[in-house]
A protein has these predicted regions:
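Fe(II)/2-oxoglutarate oxygenase catalytic core
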Residues: 1-151, 158-195
């Protein structure tokens, strides 16, 4: 696992993320971008992914393996306390990241190369920890605080993980998985291409 605080150094990008009122409009909708070797980054989320994984990655793999890397699956998520009537959940259950459409159709588990969680906006929250069970389901999880401008890279397809309940405030994050080959939902349209 890699954790980098104050990850994005580009103040104009951070300001754009803080001020974009539409960034979290599609919470839980899985999107796909084939990377800059297929098409230029044309949305704020794609520009963020390019900054995270191509221009400023603490892990060298994506920069030097575009032949192997098919692209990026990404989605946003927001969680708030269960007593707040805003239609949001207060937690995310324990799971592995995987090709969800394929798993639902066949039961086969195919996982991404690596996973990422990034916190793009300031938050004042209690709870909402990313808990990663790298020692197995029964082991004590690693608990990572949701913190503004923090990048977390981990084996999301190998280790069970979840978001602990949020008891105060609004937890906001974007998750990005790197894939090769692309998950099946790209071909079937269950994972959308963001415009």
């Amino acid at each position: 696992m890699i954790i980098v605080d104050d990850f994005i150094k580009d103040e104009s990008l951070l300001e754009e993320l803080r001020n974009d009122s539409t960034f979290f409009d599609d919470n839980g909708v899985y999107m796909w971008w084939g990377g800059p070797w297929n098409s230029p980054a044309s949305t704020l989320k794609q520009r963020l992914i390019e900054e995270m994984w191509i221009k400023n990655s603490p892990w060298d793999f994506p920069r030097y393996n575009s032949i192997i890397l098919s692209g990026f699956e990404y989605w946003t998520g927001q969680y708030s306390p269960s007593d707040v009537e805003d239609g949001k959940k207060d937690n995310l259950i324990m799971h592995y990241d995987k090709d969800e459409p394929l798993w639902h159709k066949t039961g086969e588990i195919v996982t991404p190369i690596i996973g990422t969680v990034f916190y793009p906006v300031p938050m004042d929250i209690d709870g909402g920890y990313l808990e990663i069970f790298s020692r197995g389901r029964e082991g004590e999880p690693e608990r990572i605080e949701a913190k503004y401008n923090r990048l977390v890279i981990f084996e999301a397809g190998k280790h069970l993980h979840r978001v602990s309940p949020v008891s105060r405030g609004l937890r906001s994050a974007i998750a990005v998985n790197l894939w090769s080959p692309p998950p099946s939902g790209v071909e079937t349209g269950e994972i959308i291409f963001e415009n």
